[in-house]
From Swiss-Prot:
Pfam families: Ribosomal_L2, Ribosomal_L2_C. This is Large ribosomal subunit protein uL2. One of its GO terms (cellular component) is large ribosomal subunit. The lineage of its organism: Bacteria, Pseudomonadati, Pseudomonadota, Gammaproteobacteria, Oceanospirillales. Keywords: Ribonucleoprotein, Ribosomal protein, RNA-binding, rRNA-binding. The keyword rRNA-binding applies.
Length: 274
């Protein structure tokens, strides 16, 4: 994997920094594991915008990634690593001994030819998936379940990981990259190691159009709008009326807590620091 800076042959190329990986598959993805992906443009069934800054972008196929890793006791060989337009991490196409193929999130250091396992008896090796009760304290994990059997929900993006810092009774304690310490049931599964493509954060798109290719529309400052559109709108010159920064709906936007799920507060040992 290499970080390549473009030569300034044009204004749009001047700041581009790409992350290249010669180990990724050059051909088409595995067709039986593809699904259609329709775009909503951020609108709901009434045609109203419910998610801002969404629209356009290149047409994509969804890769059906196995986040449960529930095929226990059967070895699988990594056939190839692939690019996935739907996520920052790379994915791996694995083939089980019985012939079934699945996509999984590729872990750091995974290459074609690796053997991976899942289940309580799987070896302690990067890329293998085990229940948290079978993973040694101090291990680095990713693709962590929050409910047994539901599938991985935590630490799935490029370079992400969590550390298993304690085990007590029915729960283990994980330290997440955000600084949050969280309890998770020991029956939940996690994959050993870190997520691949950690250099993803080093890339620079270089121009607004590259962001539009990804289906992201521009973000307009509230102070640049009219009073009818935003609490900061209007005024002569640059002015936001002297009030603290808020969203278009008047909710404070810097440091204001909006988390409403009190039921799972008991599982958060320490709040995130970033």
């Amino acid at each position: 994997m290499a970080v390549v800076k473009s030569k300034p042959t044009s204004a749009g190329r001047r700041h581009v920094v790409k992350v290249t990986n010669n180990d990724l598959h050059k051909g088409a993805p595995y067709a039986p594991l593809l699904d259609t992906k329709s775009k909503s443009g951020g609108r709901n069934n009434n045609g109203r915008i419910t998610t801002r800054h969404v629209g356009g972008g290149h047409k994509q196929h969804y890769r059906m990634v196995d986040f449960r890793r529930n095929k226990d006791g059967i070895s699988a060989v990594v056939e190839r690593l692939e690019y996935d337009p739907n996520r920052s991490a790379n994915i791996a196409l694995i083939r089980y001994a019985d012939g079934e193929r699945r996509y999984i999130i590729a872990s750091k250091g995974m290459v074609a030819g690796n053997i991976v396992f899942s289940g309580a008896d799987a070896p302690i090796k990067a890329g293998n998936t085990l229940p948290l009760q079978n993973i040694p304290v101090g291990s680095t994990v990713h693709c962590v379940e929050l409910k047994p059997g539901k599938g991985a929900q935590v630490a799935r993006s490029a370079g992400a990981s969590a550390q298993l810092v304690a085990r007590e009774g029915r729960y283990v304690t994980l330290r997440l990259r955000s600084g949050e310490m969280r309890k998770v049931l020991t029956e939940c599964r996690a994959t050993l190691g870190e997520v691949s493509n950690s250099e993803h954060s080093l890339r620079v798109l270089g121009k607004a159009g590259a962001t539009r290719w990804r289906g992201v529309r521009p973000t307009v400052r509230g102070a640049a709008m009219n009073p009818v559109d935003h609490p900061h709108g209007g005024g002569e010159g640059r002015s936001k009326g002297g009030r603290h920064p808020v969203t278009p709906w008047g909710v404070p936007t810097k440091g204001y807590k909006t988390r409403s799920n009190k039921r799972t507060d008991k599982l958060i040992v320490r709040r995130r620091t970033k």
